[in-house]
Regions:
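Active-site/ligand-binding loops adjacent to catalytic centers
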Residues: 14-90, 107, 129-157
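C-terminal intrinsically disordered extensions
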Residues: 12-17, 101-104, 117
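Buried hydrophobic packing segments
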Residues: 10, 77, 95-103
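Short beta-strand segments
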Residues: 26-28, 115-119
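Nucleotide donor/acceptor-binding cores
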Residues: 111-113
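Short glycine-/acidic-enriched loop or helix-start segments at secondary-structure transitions
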Residues: 8-11, 36-37, 98-99, 126-127
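Short, mixed-charge aromatic SLiMs
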Residues: 118-129
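Short, small-residue-biased leader/transition segments that mark boundaries at the very start
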Residues: 1-6
């Protein structure tokens, strides 16, 4: 769609005007064709990844694509809500996790700017990513344990 055109044009424009200093890093679920065409499998992060290359995909734009597991994306999504007060969805958690992973792997320091686009809201995920029972039933019990804080009543009563 039109959004894809803007993304491609913006990415190429920023690369051009920065003389190559700007890098475009894609975030994609482990199991998507973009991450590894030889290892396509099911994943639970919604609204991202594909099992085919759409016509709008411009492989020359991303400098790197960072793979993110469902557990990594969901944990970051829940942490963003708990620690930062940001109610975002799984693809946003995936984007933030991939930015942090990229920054660590490439030894970025405080003088380097990283911009993360968070493409979704968490409103649609109240019965999934933000539901402890759903998370446990889908194999993410360890994520629930790491991201669940005691209630105020449990802490003070």
């Amino acid at each position: 769609g039109l959004g894809d055109v803007y993304k491609r044009q913006t990415g190429h424009y920023l690369k051009d005007v920065s003389n190559g200093a700007v890098q475009v890093i894609g975030a994609d679920p482990e199991g998507s064709i973009y991450s590894d065409p030889n290892d396509v499998h099911q994943y639970q992060i919604e609204g991202v990844g594909e099992d085919f290359y759409p016509k709008a995909f411009d492989r020359s734009l991303p400098d790197e694509i960072v793979q993110v597991t469902d557990a990594e994306a969901f944990e970051m999504t829940r942490r963003l809500a708990n620690e930062e007060g940001l109610l975002v969805g799984g693809s946003s958690g995936m984007a933030v996790f991939s930015a942090l992973k990229y920054a660590r792997e490439h030894d970025l320091d405080e003088n380097q700017l990283v911009v993360v686009l968070m493409p979704d809201s968490g409103r649609s995920y109240m019965e999934k990513i933000f539901n402890d029972d759903w998370m446990r039933a889908n194999g993410f019990a360890d994520v629930v344990e790491r991201t669940t804080k005691p209630s105020l009543a449990e802490q003070y009563l």
